[in-house]
């Protein structure tokens, strides 16, 4: 790192991990990463009714926020917001503002799942956060990628982002290095398109909700995946392998509870 002229606080985190000082590493991680930049004023783009004092704070009793999400159902097929609703319904996810929902900030990354064309398995989560981290030119954003690797490869973090629980070994799966590299390539091109990088977790996606997915991809410089990444198993949210068995079952149960026919919109669990 010294030879490459790299010197930032996240190096201290890496050193702590390398020496087995996981508790100290976690403290450094929280102080040096993306979450340290959080300010309650950032709540505005999330449309939560009250200020959120922690980046990953949940909002489980906010009728106005829940209604804003529910209104996305009225958008036409192909609109970004409508496709996000499909993403939620297929997996049994609940909207922010309702019980058992993801933190509003974490829900921001669900728009990127749809926009960038990634499914919702753990492997796809690694791809999404690689894309988001590289699209942002602020080095603090790298901590988002470090977080998901610590959750879903090393297990150094037991939990993260107010919802995720650790599940080791997913980056080691065959083809994941190619898929992660391609996600970072696409994120870099997105950053270049913006001229100075873009923080996709701080975008007001509701302002874009009625626009088509294709239009938004063009505006933000989201290029197609490489053929090699697809060959290595990179999936969209709408095909076989793009949803986990647990999510598929949750989607069915949620549809039954709501009295509607379940539709996974083409998604199937991997074989």
What are the roles of these predicted feature ranges?
Residues 16, 22, 27-30, 34, ...:
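Generic preference for flexible, low-structure residues
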Residues 143, 156-271:
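C-terminal structured domains
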Residues 2-56:
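Small-residue-enriched hydrophobic alpha-helices in membranes
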Residues 5-9, 75, 211:
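Short coil/turn linker and secondary-structure boundary residues
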Residues 8-12, 16, 28-30, 97-100, ...:
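A composition-driven signal for long, intrinsically disordered, charge-rich low-complexity tracts
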Residues 49-202:
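Core of folded catalytic or high-affinity ligand/protein-binding domains
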Residues 40, 96-99, 104, 224, ...:
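Proline-rich intrinsically disordered, low-complexity coils
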């Amino acid at each position: 790192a010294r030879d490459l002229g790299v010197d930032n606080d996240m190096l201290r985190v890496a050193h702590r991990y390398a020496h087995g000082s996981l508790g100290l590493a976690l403290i450094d991680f929280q102080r040096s990463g993306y979450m340290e930049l959080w300010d309650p004023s950032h709540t505005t783009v999330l449309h939560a009714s009250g200020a959120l004092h922690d980046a990953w704070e949940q909002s489980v009793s906010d009728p106005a926020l829940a209604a804003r999400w529910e209104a996305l159902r009225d958008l036409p097929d192909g609109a970004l917001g409508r496709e996000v609703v499909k993403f939620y319904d297929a997996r049994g996810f609940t909207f922010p503002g309702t019980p058992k929902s993801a933190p509003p900030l974490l829900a921001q990354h669900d728009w990127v799942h749809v926009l960038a064309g990634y499914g919702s398995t753990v492997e796809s989560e690694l791809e999404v956060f690689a894309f988001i981290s590289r699209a942002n030119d602020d080095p603090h954003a790298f901590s988002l990628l470090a977080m998901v690797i610590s959750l879903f490869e090393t297990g150094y973090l037991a939990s993260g982002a107010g919802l995720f629980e650790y599940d080791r070994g997913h980056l080691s799966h065959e083809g994941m290095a190619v898929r992660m590299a391609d996600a970072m390539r696409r994120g870099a091109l997105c950053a270049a398109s913006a001229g100075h990088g873009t923080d996709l977790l701080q975008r007001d996606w509701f302002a874009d909700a009625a626009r088509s997915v294709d239009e938004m991809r063009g505006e933000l410089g989201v290029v197609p995946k490489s053929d090699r990444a697809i060959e290595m198993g990179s999936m969209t949210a709408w095909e076989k392998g793009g949803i986990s068995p647990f999510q598929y079952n949750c989607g069915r149960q949620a549809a039954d509870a709501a009295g509607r026919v379940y539709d996974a919109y083409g998604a199937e669990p991997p074989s």
